[in-house]
Design a protein with these regions (language model features):
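Conserved phosphate-binding elements of NTP-dependent enzyme cores
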Residues: 1-987
Length: 987
């Protein structure tokens, strides 16, 4: 039987083809389904599944159960592969060829678009406005209807045609005495001896120099070092309508001589002669006309033609020349240069702490110290600010005599003269001049990103920022948050009839795109926000808004937890957006754990029953109501309320009324807050998206504690001080970043258990006979690793215009080690066999070795018994990586004075995983430690001992503490959205 055509009895054997009610899905037109047969990618167990097309379909299940394997690695990957396969071989050369996922057949697929969290732009030039393409339309709008101004005096400037200028002149009072001038020199130094001869030959007779009119053959002698203004007298006339033709011809000639700029002097003097007279402000009125954009007061400020590229900070025409359009510059941070506790001689100047005591650099600094009255043998903290400034910025051209005990190019005992450049100028020069990437990166350790002092973060040239629409330049528009931008665009912007024809369609597109961003809960984001500062959830929702704006139909969208980082209040907006995408006749496939999203789905698929090797099966599929009634579905039990995360019976009290207090927090949108975090309890910082939670906890608290307690080179956000740090000895940030950056990293190496395993193998009789040490059992260094694949287990074969192919190493057959290392065994297993064990298997295998077993048990306890000891770090989800980190912390001895900081630890976790996570976090706090969690998940919020709720809105309308207290106290507070939603969860 082909294409899954089976009778009903056979269908009932695989619930993936059935709704929980038992009816086969094939009752409808087969074309209405994506039909998957025999999917075996990663841990999928040969599953068969029909997914309805043009519906909102949610895939859920435990972390590691195979949701992403089905949605992304199978369905999306195959949809994308087929689309790429349909292109020419020339196009595929640039796009690459995707591997075919492991399945029998898939029918009914559409071209697929993935909207995940891993594709966030890391380009510092990308902003919210550029990613959503709103900036492209803003550039077009400003280029077509923007009003240019002088960047110095800010007066409006315009350009006119010859006819416009002539008509303006003819409107002056009849009988006016006028002199038409063509500016040929404007505020330039020189004698300009050539002017007299050059223009006499062209038939001109008079010139105005610095306000005084001269005959050209009597051109004055000018001071070479002074700035001068020189205008050629093109014509003189008394205004009369009959002179229209002459005036028009003269103005045209003057515009050509003045390169588009002319001056018209309205003379108030009645005398007939003008030679030698100072025709300045007292007796004349100066009128300036231009064919180009030019300021009459500052004519040297050239304003180019308004084109879209002029408003791009990625193009040299518009980008700030100082920061090249980045808005920021890398600059040496004096705080990172000094180690205040050491003397200069001991290496207190970090960039030069490896120099020898008799080095040229140190001798020169000793000479500076001797002359300016300080010693290189006292701790830097004891030096005055003035002395530190000398060390950092040098002493100018002041020279010092330095005696050298000769070596190399220096003569022994010779005395040399030298200036002292200063630490910061020296590092800046070397950073600019060096061709060595190593040297540049080494210097960048002492640099920090600072706002560009030329454009002040606007990224554009002053002349570009002087172009406005209703008083706002393009940077002002981008500095608005999404909500404020919509308010501005909803106003009745006044344009001329011609401008309105141009602006109306552009504004319509901008308004739509910004509205879509508001609809996905991003109303607090400023359009100028750098894309690389967005969280995964924010970046994903921006891409979602962009896709809605594209208006595509008949597409398969695959999304990965779009509700991440979203407050419950904004969830309804997100669900409406997903439905809107579906209503455009698209299939929307969402991997999600949020209960509201699941209940809003047209179709729900539950993958399980466990994680890893114990998962990969379709447990239940059908409408949310059908899943809720399915006793086999773990998800269904939580949806129906049959299973719940219990509310804690008691709440912990702060440890002896001890608090960690942040005073005067002013970073980003924080409103000069003073916040008290109780010690010895679990505190959740909640609040709507963009309210300032991450700024307070990560940028200020975590960075300051890491710098103070661990000497990390982190710079805390703006605040006055933090009190109570002396009650802590460690600060550990447990986030969802990978546990390693290379495929060689794995749980065994990260947790440190691999060291104990290698040492165990080194004690085996065979290893001792051969003299093997623990290093012999490392796959990262020569000795025991296979040198054919250098310990990778696979060899990479470059396929040029095809993607690289990885082939199992023919020498070690994927075992990573050479034959000699594999001959050493423990309980019949070699080192490669151990790395291929799951955590569950390894716990049993090493049960008699506490140093190994105890660490592995903590990984087992966090629900990761299914992962393998040697599994590559790059294959773990964010939730799995975070739980490995938590397990590592659990295995360490608790001091009771540790602060743990977690940012949305429930990302990627099923409700049952959240239940398990809460029990583990409770164990960490039970040891007397303190935990601060940023979280939207109401199960975590209700389990907290203390809640700090921020708001009331996001962006500039946030940054305040709107409620503090126990979950029960917050739930009674009608002023906080968190409290309103929390009430249901406390019942």
């Amino acid at each position: 039987m082909e294409n899954g055509t089976k009778n009903v009895e056979e269908l009932t054997k695989n619930k993936g083809l059935l709704s929980p009610g038992g009816k086969a899905l094939l009752k409808d037109n087969p074309d209405n389904y994506i039909k998957i047969r025999g999917a075996r990618q990663n841990n999928l167990k040969n599953i068969d599944l029909d997914i309805p097309r043009d519906k909102l379909v949610v895939i859920t299940g435990l972390s590691g159960s195979g949701k992403s394997s089905l949605a992304f690695d199978t369905i999306y990957a195959e949809g994308q592969r087929r689309y790429v396969e349909s292109l020419s071989s020339y196009a595929r050369m640039f796009l690459g060829v995707m591997d075919k996922p492991d399945f029998d057949t898939i029918t009914g697929l559409s071209p697929a678009i993935s909207i995940d969290q891993k594709s966030t732009s890391r380009n510092p030039r990308s902003t919210v406005a550029t990613v959503t393409e709103v900036y492209d339309y803003l550039r077009l709008l400003f280029a077509r209807v923007g009003v240019p101004h002088c960047p110095i005096c800010h007066r409006e400037v315009s350009k006119r045609s010859v006819e416009d200028i002539v008509n303006e002149v003819m409107k002056l009072p009849i009988g006016s005495k006028l002199m038409l001038l063509a500016p040929i020199v404007q505020q330039k130094k020189g004698e300009f001896l050539h002017i007299s001869e050059q223009y006499l030959q062209k038939g001109f007779s008079r010139v105005r120099v610095d306000g005084v009119v001269y005959a050209l053959d009597e051109f004055p002698t000018l001071e070479k070092q002074e700035r001068h203004d020189i205008e050629l007298v093109v014509d003189r006339f008394i205004l009369n309508p009959e002179l229209y033709s002459r005036i028009s011809s003269s103005i045209e000639q003057a515009l050509e001589l003045g390169q588009g700029l002319i001056m018209l002097l309205k003379i108030n003097d009645n005398s007939s002669t003008i030679e030698g007279k100072n025709l300045g402000k007292s007796n004349t009125e100066v009128l300036t006309y231009s064919q180009r954009y030019a300021c009459p007061v500052h004519p040297d400020e050239l304003i180019p033609e308004l084109e879209p590229r002029l408003f791009s900070f990625n193009a040299p025409q518009g980008a700030c020349p100082t920061c090249t359009g980045l808005g920021t510059r890398m600059e040496i941070d004096p705080n990172l240069v000094f180690n205040q506790n050491l003397t200069i001689a001991e290496g207190g100047i970090r960039p030069f702490n490896r120099v020898q005591s008799d080095s040229w650099w140190l001798k020169r600094l000793s000479a500076v110290a001797a002359r300016h009255g300080f010693s290189i043998h006292v701790p830097i903290r004891e030096l005055t600010e003035e002395q530190k400034h000398l060390i950092l910025y040098g002493t100018g051209n002041e020279k010092y005599e330095i005696k050298i005990s000769g070596s190399g190019k220096f003569k022994d005992g010779a005395t040399y003269e030298s200036i002292y450049e200063g630490v910061i100028p020296t590092l800046e020069r070397r950073h600019k001049e060096t061709d060595s990437d190593f040297m540049r990166k080494d210097i960048e350790r002492f640099m920090r990103v600072h706002e560009c002092q030329t454009c002040h973060g606007a990224r554009l040239k002053p002349v570009v920022l002087a172009v406005t629409i209703h008083g706002l330049n393009i940077n002002d528009f981008c500095n608005l948050d999404v909500d404020a931008m919509l308010d501005v665009l909803s106003q009745d912007l006044e344009f001329t009839e011609a401008e309105a024809l141009i602006a109306r369609p552009i504004l319509k597109v901008i308004r739509e795109r910004v509205k879509f961003m508001q609809d996905v809960g991003l109303g607090y984001l400023e359009l100028s926000r750098a894309a690389n500062t967005l969280s995964g959830g924010e970046a994903q929702r921006i891409r979602l808004a962009t896709q809605i704006g594209s208006g595509l139909q008949g597409v398969l969208y695959v999304l990965d937890e779009p509700s991440i980082g979203l407050h419950q209040r904004d969830n309804d907006k997100l669900i409406s957006t997903l439905r809107h995408l579906r209503d455009l006749r698209n299939t929307v496939l969402v991997v999600e754990h949020d209960e509201d999203t699941m209940m809003s789905a047209d179709y729900l698929i539950d993958i399980g029953p466990g994680a890893g090797a114990r998962g990969g099966q379709v447990i239940s599929a059908g409408t949310p109501e059908e899943i809720a009634n399915d006793s086999d579905s773990l998800t269904g039990k939580y949806l129906s309320g049959a299973k719940k995360i219990p509310v804690p019976k008691t709440r912990r009290k702060p440890k002896l009324n001890q608090y960690l207090t942040v005073v005067g927090a002013r970073e980003n949108n924080l409103k000069n807050l003073t916040v008290k975090f109780p010690l010895g309890v679990m505190t959740v910082v909640s609040g709507v998206s963009g309210s300032g939670k991450s700024t307070l906890v990560n940028e200020i608290l975590a960075n300051e504690l890491l710098a103070r307690l661990h000497r990390a080179q982190t710079v805390a956000g703006e605040h006055e001080r933090i009190d109570g740090i002396d009650n802590l000895d460690k600060c550990i940030v447990i986030d969802q970043s990978p546990i390693g950056r290379t495929p060689r990293s794995n749980p065994a190496t990260y947790t440190g258990v691999f060291t104990a395993i290698r040492e165990l193998f080194a004690t085996q009789p065979e290893a001792e006979i051969r003299g093997y040490k623990a290093g012999r059992f490392s796959f990262n260094v020569k000795g025991g690793r296979c040198e054919t694949c250098q310990g990778d287990g696979v060899n990479k074969i470059e396929m040029h215009f095809l993607p690289d192919v990885y082939v199992t190493c023919p020498t070690c057959h994927g075992k990573r080690y050479n034959r000699e290392a594999l001959e050493v065994k423990y309980k019949g297993k070699d080192i490669s066999d151990v790395l291929n064990m799951t955590i569950d298997e390894a716990v049993e295998f090493f049960e008699n070795i506490p140093a190994i077993a105890n660490k592995l048990k903590t990984i087992q306890e966090v629900g990761l018994g299914y992962i393998r000891l040697g599994q590559s770090a790059t294959t773990f989800s964010g939730g799995e990586a975070q739980r490995i980190k938590i397990a590592t912390e659990l295995s360490r001895r608790s001091t009771g004075k540790t602060l743990y900081i977690l940012d949305e630890p429930t990302t990627g976790l099923h409700t049952d995983d959240v239940n398990r996570l809460l029990k583990i976090l409770d164990r960490l706090v039970a040891g007397g430690n303190t935990m601060i969690i940023i979280e939207h998940n109401l199960h975590v919020i209700k389990s907290a001992d203390w809640i700090i709720d921020m708001g009331p809105e996001g962006g500039q309308h946030g940054g305040q503490i709107i409620a503090e207290g126990t979950p029960e106290e917050i739930a009674k507070n009608d002023q906080t959205p968190t409290g309103v939603y929390l009430r249901e969860f406390l019942k």
